[in-house]
Amino acid sequence: MSELVPPNIPAEFLPRHIALVMDGNGRWATEKGMKRTEGHRRGEAVLLDVVDACLALGVPYLSAYAFSTENWRRSTEEVRFLMGFNRDVLRRQRDGLHEKGVRVRWVGRRPRLWRSVIRELEAAEELTKDNTNMTLAMCVNYGGRAEIIDAAREIARQAAAGQLRPEQINEKTFPDFLDEPDMPDVDLFLRPSGEKRTSNFLLWQSAYAEMVYQDKLFPDFTPQDLFDAVEEYARRDRRFGTA
């Protein structure tokens, strides 16, 4: 990061929240004749570079799609690797993130997730809970539809118990039932790899997000690619449904 200078973008034109789909790790490795797992290893370093780039820009919130609820459909070998890998990444990187003033938050479901992964996620949250330079939401065992379903179930439970009236639920109160109620809406939805879809990521939060898709696979993604995406975001006219 030291040799890169972030673009000079006024704070009011910066995204407050970037959602990052870290896509293409497996394809990157396959194209190079490596095991798919090597692509994920490379992705760890790239994510840290993205965090540094966000800090340099002054972007306060980054959500990283680390493991989706659909990823359980992958081979047993790859799922086992990804569970251990996510656990070890948190263990390796939490102190460094803490030193940079990054607050780590976990967004996702507990069921099926390895207990060792949960322990590391909770340890990272506890260590970094008072940091204010930036928030990194690690989305592990996360799915946008699952999050909305879980919220709907909790609303139904409270309504059945007489704790909640239907008219109390609206666009302002519904997020209180999501995995991370304090998460701001996504401003910039960024996906490398050439794929142009949301893949069930932060569906509620991304209602008015600006989508930027880049052709580069995630292991080849650089801070400059992030800067380019943020510059494109800053040039757009966000109307939020108005004329």
Swiss-Prot record:
The active site is at residues 23, 71. Its EC number is 2.5.1.-. GO terms for molecular function: ditrans,polycis-undecaprenyl-diphosphate synthase [(2E,6E)-farnesyl-diphosphate specific] activity; magnesium ion binding; manganese ion binding; Z-farnesyl diphosphate synthase activity. One of its GO terms (biological process) is polyprenol biosynthetic process. GO terms for cellular component: cytosol; plasma membrane. Substrate binds at residues 24-28, 36, 40, 68-70, 72, 74, 191, 197-199. Its cofactor is Mg(2+). InterPro entries: UPP_synth-like, UPP_synth-like_CS, UPP_synth-like_sf. It is an enzyme of class 2 (transferase). Pfam families: Prenyltransf. Mg(2+) binds at residues 23, 210. Catalyzes the condensation of isopentenyl diphosphate (IPP) with allylic pyrophosphates generating different type of terpenoids. HAMAP family: ISPT. Homodimer. Belongs to the UPP synthase family. NCBIfam families: PRK14829.1, uppS. This is Isoprenyl transferase 2.
